[in-house]
Amino acid sequence: TFTEYGDSSAPSHFGPVRNPWNTERVPGGSSGGSAAAVAAGLCYAALGSDTGGSIRQPAAYCSIVGLKPTYGLVSTRGVVPLSWSLDHIGPMCRTVADAALALQPIAGHDPLDTNSVAATPPDYAASLRQSVSAVRLGIPRAVFYEALDPEIERTISDALRVLQKLTASTRDVELPRYNNLPVVGAEAYTFHAPYFTKTPERYQSMTRRRLEAGSRVTAAAYIEGRRELDRLRHAVVSAFSTVDLLVTPTTPILPTTVTQALNDPGTPPPGGVALSLRNTQPFDIYGLPCISVPCGFSRSGLPIGLSISGPHLGEREVLALAHAYEQ
């Protein structure tokens, strides 16, 4: 089942997507159908789109691997956009090796995509064999490690101990902070305006409300948001002056119930959508490669994910450490 225009995975035309690990829970979104299909063994791999966490959140919630590549590494040509400035396309698989293989044929420059990066992809599968013993890990504790579900906090602490044995060092780092950027709403409305203004009744209620909100973003606010986005993508480079990779919990909370997701109060509830994307959205903003790998389960059997992020075009290093941890 598919969600409407990358909005979420609960309100779908064919009914809500359900988590294979607990069918009363959501699989995450918006690529929840892709994640659920991979987790249930219905396919070897699936593609997801990620604007605020829509590959990695479902990967964490469904105990699979989800890779959001560097912005522009995989062409978005032909994809219905949510936000031209933030959309990423990447693979969702059961193992890191599968993710490396799935990334290979879709990565690379597309001259017909204005956001495509002019880069020649390396052999991603070969990167799984490279040593990670010299890797310096960065831990951005501010924001990313705050207000975690106690079971996620416990599981991530265990994962960090494993990573410390695999790598050279760990140290705390600071990442650039930002306020809410109105870029997504404005760009989503711009794409949908020709259809939305003529037949708004064809859109689901949640999508309709969010598009209406995007229509109210002023030109000045959008321009300032784009300027801030460019600043953040330049500023985050300095975070890798003393570390090679970053490690964060993929989500600060466990998957909510389908019933809660369908209630749709119109604005994110406490602990709801905004919080569930708190740890994933920054890496869309920064445009950095980020992979979520399974790292355990809650006592009630709900999956928990660990994220590893790298510098611009650092997919090889991200995959290498993710694979080493997985083993």
Regions found by a protein language model. Name each.
Residues T1-I89, A142, T248-P269:
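Short glycine/serine-rich loop/turn segments
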Residues A10-G15, N180-Y195:
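Charged, often glycine-rich, active-site loop that binds/positions anionic groups
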Residues H13, T23-R25, T114-V117, Y222-E228, ...:
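Short, flexible loop segments at the rims of nucleotide/cofactor-binding pockets, characterized by
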Residues A40-E146, S157-L166, V217, I223-R227, ...:
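Structural helix-boundary/capping segments
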Residues R141, Y145, L175-E187, R210-G214, ...:
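A short beta-alpha structural unit
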Residues E153-S157, A186-Y189:
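Short, surface-exposed alpha-helical segments at coil->helix boundaries
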Residues T167, H192-I285:
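Serine-dependent amide/ester hydrolase catalytic core
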Residues S169-E174:
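General small-molecule cofactor/ligand-binding pocket signal
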